[in-house]
């Protein structure tokens, strides 16, 4: 499986609690912070919840 580079590009002010929880689970706390996670269905599900707050790139 590949890897996903997930970058937060919007803040969490006014976000719903489940979106805040998803961001914390992904390991994102600050704007422009990036993390690399494995491309698994559970990570894809977390990204789907916060797709409007992050950008996702595939990394080899």
From Swiss-Prot:
One of its GO terms (cellular component) is cytosolic large ribosomal subunit. It comes from the Bacteria. SUPFAM superfamilies: Ribosomal protein L30p/L7e (SSF55129). GO terms for biological process: translation. Part of the 50S ribosomal subunit. Belongs to the universal ribosomal protein uL30 family. This is Large ribosomal subunit protein uL30. It comes from Saccharopolyspora erythraea (strain ATCC 11635 / DSM 40517 / JCM 4748 / NBRC 13426 / NCIMB 8594 / NRRL 2338).
């Amino acid at each position: 499986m590949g890897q996903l580079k997930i970058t937060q590009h919007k803040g969490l002010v006014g976000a719903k609690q489940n979106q805040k929880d998803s961001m914390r689970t992904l390991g994102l706390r600050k704007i422009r912070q990036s993390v690399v996670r494995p491309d698994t269905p559970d990570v894809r599900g977390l990204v789907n919840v916060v797709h409007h707050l992050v950008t996702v790139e595939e990394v080899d």
